[in-house]
């Protein structure tokens, strides 16, 4: 992965109709396409949560996708981002679905 610019890390939680609509699978695919690492999982309260890490521009692209696009049959009401920070190195080697 090219590290043009600072590396960023951000936590996210997506609200809406995001479970049972292949949201995690599409999130993993989009993350790999953009070139970010991290993870995604369903929560017990019906949301999807996770973390994204990578070059700032790629993290911003993923944030936009998590806020506006999602999987084809999902309906995103809102996405909360928290704990956004600059990191010195990536903590993950890929993007994965957690269970």
From Swiss-Prot:
Pfam families: Acylphosphatase. The modification N-acetylserine is found at residue 2. Residues 9-99 form the Acylphosphatase-like domain. Gene3D superfamilies: 3.30.70.100. The active site is at 24, 42. Keywords: Acetylation, Disulfide bond, Glutathionylation, Hydrolase, Phosphoprotein. Its EC number is 3.6.1.7. It is an enzyme of class 3 (hydrolase). SUPFAM superfamilies: Acylphosphatase/BLUF domain-like. The modification S-glutathionyl cysteine is found at residue 22. It catalyses: an acyl phosphate + H2O = a carboxylate + phosphate + H(+). GO terms for molecular function: acylphosphatase activity. PROSITE patterns: ACYLPHOSPHATASE_1, ACYLPHOSPHATASE_2, ACYLPHOSPHATASE_3. The modification Phosphoserine is found at residue 93. Belongs to the acylphosphatase family. Monomer (RA1) and homodimer (RA3); disulfide linked. Its physiological role is not yet clear. This is Acylphosphatase-2.
């Amino acid at each position: 992965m090219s590290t043009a610019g600072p590396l960023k890390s951000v936590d996210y939680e997506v609200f809406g109709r995001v479970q049972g609509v292949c949201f995690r699978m599409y999130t993993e695919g989009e993350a790999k396409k953009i070139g970010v690492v991290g993870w995604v999982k369903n929560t017990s309260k019906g949301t999807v949560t996770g973390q994204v890490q990578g070059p700032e521009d790629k993290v911003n692209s993923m944030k936009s996708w998590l806020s506006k696009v999602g999987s084809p049959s999902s309906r995103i009401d809102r996405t909360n981002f928290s704990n956004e920070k600059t990191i010195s190195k990536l903590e993950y080697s890929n993007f994965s679905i957690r269970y």
